Amino acid sequence: KDWPAEERLYRFDASNDFAVYFGDPDHPLPLAEAKTQLMTIRDSTLVTLRIALGIWNLRKHNPSLISPTGRIPITYDEILAWQGRRKHSYVSGGKRITDGYRPEDREEVRDDLKLASMIYLKGDRTIYINGRQQKSHFEGRYIDVTFWDYPSLFSGEKPRLQGVTFVPGGWMDAYASANNIYLAEIDRRVFQLHKHHEQHALRLAFFLADEWRSHAYDTHHDYIFTMAELLARSVIRVDKRNLTNRLAPSIEKSLELLRARGIIGSYECLAPIDKSKPQWGNDWLASRWRILPPESLLQSYMAKGIAQPSASTQARLSPPKHRRGRTPKGG
């Protein structure tokens, strides 16, 4: 994402109408320092943040895990596992030994969360409380984290990085009344996917759950993406060499898996691709896809007076008919 500099801050306008700032607007970093920090943001930063928000949304209902201030513990190893990262291993005595994630892997997750904690939101939104519109102003951190680690037992060694206590900023409270129960159920289903064998499905699900959450107060919920946009926003790399023989089948299989698991309500390609043509991969990347939230989430929005069903939403509140068969495995 390009972050233009505005006055003393880098900022951009998000698709949900919030102004997103890098750094505290009241105590801004020097622009040169802020730019240096921004350049360290990578694809994993977004994936890490989505995973942490999903874990928080699940654990906040567990009184043994959540603190009075709404914080929940998350270890770096949990996030690395959901990213699909493999643990370090080596061969000894003819056997392969696994000794966990490398310290530098944990440092990457720590850096991701530290960068995300420097993001601030500011803006006015119309929210719905008991079916009535109400103007609200939001300003503050996107997330708040406290880092913890274990001191080393040996002099000169670095502490062992463990994890964070994590809580979203106050912006989350505004959305809680809209979709709290239903999004928690979606997150529960997402975290039942396989960490390694269903990574494409996980990346798509993390993005789409984030989309349902951040656009909860939109009046319409027709989500249309080009396939290239869907992959980019889901942080899925496009392998051009294996586009038609591996990536495209895996993504379409993953979408069907998400529908079968109730993580999305329905999906369709608005102009089907002629896959009998040679080199159809670019057409597939440019194709437009409509993806709807689960029926339970849409109906809860309409019951609360938040959403108004468009013609396409109304027609697709029930999942489309699919051939019977086993639930697909992977992505």
Model feature map: region roles:
Residues 1-331:
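Charged, alpha-helix-forming regions
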